[in-house]
């Protein structure tokens, strides 16, 4: 399946506690259709110290994945979410925004 969102894309969160926030996609998990977005869905985890591994304990902030359907690609020029369309250019498949036909880098 071809995803319209890829790593390093600028996305906006559509639903949930972080609705309206914009971030960059760090990683995509294709097996369960989730993405990790930088600075979004941050939780605090209480970590026990492990002396054998020289790992200190404490409270760690961690980014958890969110479902890919809850994010949309963000168009900087229009400052809103947008749809993606694929097209062929010089024998290569490219992506662009549907509203203003601008290429997605």
Swiss-Prot record:
<dbReference type="GO" id="GO:0003735">
    <property type="term" value="F:structural constituent of ribosome"/>
</dbReference>
<comment type="similarity">
    <text>Belongs to the universal ribosomal protein uL24 family.</text>
</comment>
<dbReference type="GO" id="GO:0005840">
    <property type="term" value="C:ribosome"/>
</dbReference>
<dbReference type="Pfam" id="PF00467">
    <property type="entry name" value="KOW"/>
</dbReference>
<dbReference type="GO" id="GO:0019843">
    <property type="term" value="F:rRNA binding"/>
</dbReference>
<dbReference type="InterPro" id="IPR014722">
    <property type="entry name" value="Rib_uL2_dom2"/>
</dbReference>
<dbReference type="GO" id="GO:1990904">
    <property type="term" value="C:ribonucleoprotein complex"/>
</dbReference>
<dbReference type="InterPro" id="IPR005824">
    <property type="entry name" value="KOW"/>
</dbReference>
<comment type="function">
    <text>One of the proteins that surrounds the polypeptide exit tunnel on the outside of the subunit.</text>
</comment>
<dbReference type="InterPro" id="IPR005825">
    <property type="entry name" value="Ribosomal_uL24_CS"/>
</dbReference>
<keyword id="KW-0687">Ribonucleoprotein</keyword>
<dbReference type="Pfam" id="PF17136">
    <property type="entry name" value="ribosomal_L24"/>
</dbReference>
<dbReference type="InterPro" id="IPR003256">
    <property type="entry name" value="Ribosomal_uL24"/>
</dbReference>
<keyword id="KW-0699">rRNA-binding</keyword>
<keyword id="KW-0689">Ribosomal protein</keyword>
<dbReference type="InterPro" id="IPR008991">
    <property type="entry name" value="Translation_prot_SH3-like_sf"/>
</dbReference>
<comment type="subunit">
    <text>Part of the 50S ribosomal subunit.</text>
</comment>
<protein>
    <recommendedName>
        <fullName>Large ribosomal subunit protein uL24</fullName>
    </recommendedName>
</protein>
<dbReference type="GO" id="GO:0006412">
    <property type="term" value="P:translation"/>
</dbReference>
<dbReference type="InterPro" id="IPR041988">
    <property type="entry name" value="Ribosomal_uL24_KOW"/>
</dbReference>
<comment type="function">
    <text>One of two assembly initiator proteins, it binds directly to the 5'-end of the 23S rRNA, where it nucleates assembly of the 50S subunit.</text>
</comment>
<keyword id="KW-0694">RNA-binding</keyword>
